[in-house]
């Protein structure tokens, strides 16, 4: 994990510990530098990361302020940090662990049809199934994987164990009806609605390392999204009445 990411996590923990609410102001850049014993550029990178995650916002000339927190039990559609930090009592069941080539369209997202680690998992929150997940990790990029690792946080293993930096993702979503095999795992009926998400995650150099299909239980999954604190400029010449 990069130094600015560690600092960002510490600032987020500070917000939680001190029960800061929407509109509360963070310490100044100078105060944060002194508190965490890092340079100005590291603090600015950490603030930028927190801004992108929808945790804080900047007001020019005034400082950095806390944004509203997400509701309990809601998962961010755009956060790449995984489920564990937002869900209550999450558990993971590894249904299948194998080595195989990905099918279309997953091999297209990976730009490769090489042999991958294939992991099929059922994720639960407070004992209730909320997502069925099928993931492919190219062996040329993720050289080692095990069922034991898959039972925990794969992303923590990639970041902390393999020292790889996870940067961004592409998501394609649609609503459809459940197949019989999916319904069995999600404890629903065949033909019930679901949200299907195709996820591709990339390393810092732009290499795709994870292509996944996630099928969400419509009864046990709730989502939210927050735009980042970017200045949006609108050209009124393009607006129509």
Located regions from the model:
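Basic, helix-initiating cap at the start of DNA-binding domains
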Residues: 1-9
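Residue-level marker of alpha-helix boundaries and capping positions
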Residues: 2, 37-38, 145
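N-terminal helix-turn-helix
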Residues: 10-66
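All-alpha effector-binding/dimerization core of bacterial HTH-type transcriptional repressors
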Residues: 68-235
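Conserved small/polar residues in nucleotide/adenosyl-binding loops
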Residues: 237-241
